[in-house]
Amino acid sequence: MNFHEYQSKQLLAEYGIPVPSGKVAATPDEAVDVATSLGKGPWMVKAQIHAGGRGKAGGVKFCKTTDDVKAAAAKMLGTKMSTYQTAGVELPINLVLVTTAGEIVKELYLSILVDRGTKTITYIASSEGGVEIEQVAAETPELIHALNVDFVEGVQGYHGRDFGFKLGLNAKQAGQFASIMVNLYKLFNEKDLALVEINPLAILDDGNLYALDGKFDSDDNAAFRQKQLVAMRDKTQEDETEVTASELDINYVTMDGNIGCMVNGAGLAMATMDVIKLNGGEPANFLDVGGGANKQRVIEAFKLILSSDKVEGIFVNIFGGIVRCDMIAEGIIAAVKEVGVKVPVVVRLEGTNVEEGKQLLRDSGMAIIPADNINDGAKKVVEAVKNAA
């Protein structure tokens, strides 16, 4: 789950990490009220969407007067914005964040994440903030510093001070940096986060460090115990079909192709998409119907796939381990009847009760194309889509 900047800053502030004063507004007049309450300008007005790159897209404005604040908010609110991170998708701007705007002396980068390679929680820091860390890694890798945290010791103040000195901070700032690192570690663990990125972590003209922007990713598997984070979810920023899928507890990701996929198991689902690509097709989605799939779940999965008008064919690839192939077959037959599937459907079944499942499909009288294996199924669905065009 992703979060808006204002939500990220709220969490940072709760854990003692300094952020500029600010508040969100839903109308231009509210934006002016917020600016006035913050005191004398200047201010920043920032569009709240689930994406970076807002500045280049016109979503971050420096304002010297309340008239500027009102104009900036009016230009953003109620519109949609795409950035280099949204892959052409336009996201609605329902809120703007109005904050104080201090003069930036220096921009740093700081993040904390799970490093699967070292199996540790890892900090990444750089003296080059305000730009994409991938760009820094490619052009000046010597400016990036990493710290793998020992699970027993945790992160200590001396880790942060050492990091701070490597970034060129003075003694006072290095102490602040250490405090931020320690608090960030606590936030990361207590909220079950997968990533926290502060970019930039800036030194302002008062000589102190502030988190000017924050990006959070949470571990959805821990959502059951993170009610505060779940309440922050903004479904208007998400793909509508993916939201529906999450409510049904189906793992679904929209893709750009025209061949819908229904598979059980994430690994098999990814392999299925790969084999479709190898056979000249383009998957329209990732869909893991889950090991505990039942008839109704299969029907809902078909509805999700066919909610996209781009889908011109469907490949159902099921390995019956926990789930039974005959039950999947019953779900496919019911789905084709209920949803009114008008595109070619290729089905590959293997595993528990496979013969019973195949017999049900044969006896259904429906134009369902059987496949012997994953490659055969991919070839058949690609061919069927071409022939139907």
From Swiss-Prot:
PROSITE patterns: ATP_GRASP (PS50975), SUCCINYL_COA_LIG_3 (PS01217)
Gene Ontology CC annotations of this record: succinate-CoA ligase complex
Cofactor(s) required for function per UniProt: Mg(2+)
InterPro entries: ATP-grasp, ATP-grasp_succ-CoA_synth-type, ATP_grasp_subdomain_1, Succ-CoA_synthase_bsu_CS, SUCC_ACL_C, Succ_CoA_ligase-like_bsu, Succinyl-CoA_synth-like
Cofactor binding note from Swiss-Prot or TrEMBL: Binds 1 Mg(2+) ion per subunit.
SUPFAM superfamilies reported in the protein's UniProt record: Glutathione synthetase ATP-binding domain-like, Succinyl-CoA synthetase domains
Domain (ATP-grasp) ranges: 9-244
Disulfide bridges in this chain: none
Subunit relationships: Heterotetramer of two alpha and two beta subunits.
Function summary: Succinyl-CoA synthetase functions in the citric acid cycle (TCA), coupling the hydrolysis of succinyl-CoA to the synthesis of either ATP or GTP and thus represents the only step of substrate-level phosphorylation in the TCA. The beta subunit provides nucleotide specificity of the enzyme and binds the substrate succinate, while the binding sites for coenzyme A and phosphate are found in the alpha subunit.
Protein name according to UniProt: Succinate--CoA ligase [ADP-forming] subunit beta
Lineage: Bacteria, Pseudomonadati, Pseudomonadota, Gammaproteobacteria, Lysobacterales
